[in-house]
Amino acid sequence: GISKLQAQEVADRGFNVIVRPTNYRNVTSEDLQYVFKRLEGIPHVTGMIFAGKEALGAPNLTDETLELLHKNHIPLVGIEAVNQLQYEPQQGFLEMAAKDEYSVGRVYTIAKDELKKITPEEAAQRFYISDIERNIRFNLFPMYETGVNNETVLQTTINYIGMATEKLAAKGYEFGPADIYPPYTPNPLLVVLTMTGAIALFVYVVQMLIPMPKHTQLVAFFGISLVSIVVFIVTSGTLITQIWALSSAVMAPVGAMIRLMEEWRRYDSARPLGATKATVLALFYLVIAALFAAIGGMYIASLLGNTKFFMEFAIFRGVKLTFVLPVILVMIAYLQRFPLWKGRMINSKEEAKKFVVEFLTMDVKFYVFFVVAALGAVAWVFVGRSGHTAGVPVPTSELMLRRFLENTMYARPREKEFIIGHPALMLATFAFLRKWPSVIHFLLTLAGVIGIASMVETFCHLRTPVFMSIMRGYDGLLIGALLGLLLIIAVRFMMYATQWFQAREVDHE
């Protein structure tokens, strides 16, 4: 039930009222009427959050509960799950949300056990980030059980709420009755048009990996498009759009990297370029690759841009694949275009078969096992830190860097982009144009695809506003380009220093 006296007291003190009814055992229509009757005369009731594991009216009377909510103009609000992915399970809630066309509120809170472990500053930061990045419009601030910095429990709690409020106000957020996202479904014709664009991207990239004549490409494009459109019409459309969103997330960075390889090959037979020109081209090609990959991000946002995904009642499937597959496909494309394996390019069926046989039968030194183990550890961290939830803990130093970036930039860029991917890709271009060893260029290229793929994967988190995803990629590109330039300068300095010392040794001899 609901305490009418408490609700009235909250309203009398000038606050908005959020009610949290508990479901009845063997609930009846009379029980529901009783709950809402107790709300009569109480002003500013701006949301209902169910307590416990059941929605009010579950399992059979949730339609009646929803009707009473509409009648009293009270928004339905779901509780974000502890892992920050979708919602806490409450029987009947998902069905009610679907009938409301997913136009519901989303509340974020911190578990009391977790609150004990973090500072008030960290708690305020978590509420701030949750609100701006995950479509949170309701905050449930728990109270600290003990005071901090010689303050009372109440003052400590008020202080961290105040810090969160100040941060949000600086971002332009207003406080009061929370806005509820209206139902939004894009025009089906525009979705189909975007889907055909994603199919065209798929065919375009596949033919760069498996060469095919123009007429075969056209047949593949029109055939796949026809089947996809039929599936879209016959079904609700969610599954087929998810498939092509996943395809875009993989093919866009792969296509960007292959096009970049084709540009590199233009300089394959030429003499090493000057260091300055190679540096300028490294920056230029990074920007071009990022813009190409952004096509995939726009396709994802357009295909899955509806309230069901915004409010995370449906999520992008295959996030980890968007990190692994681009690396594998780019590795294949590289071996097709550059003579890395024993001075040969693997660009035919015969060469591919020969490569497999030679690879599986080659002699392996003992140290290779340590190298493979190290690469496996890197892959574990890389994949484990990706996706909607992270399975690898984040070190304290990185958390400090994240908080700094969150407070100084519009959207915190991803470390794998501006620390690893973008600088590595710039150095890969520089390495090729300066005729460095092929193995170094190959490894830098694989590291470079991480940043480009991560830029596209950012758009797979549909709960984050698309403009923020764009700015996250832009900020990462900006910092990554600066770090890439510094990396190239540092490498050039080390090479010059090495040559100078070698020349001195020769002179002394």
Where are the language model's segments positioned?
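Soluble extramembrane regions of membrane proteins in the secretory/endomembrane system
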Residues: 1-188
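Charge-biased, low-complexity intrinsically disordered regions
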Residues: 6, 10, 35-39, 43-44, ...
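Substrate-binding cleft/loops of secretory-pathway carbohydrate-active enzymes
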Residues: 88-96, 188-201, 453-456
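Alpha-helical transmembrane segments of integral membrane proteins
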Residues: 196-509
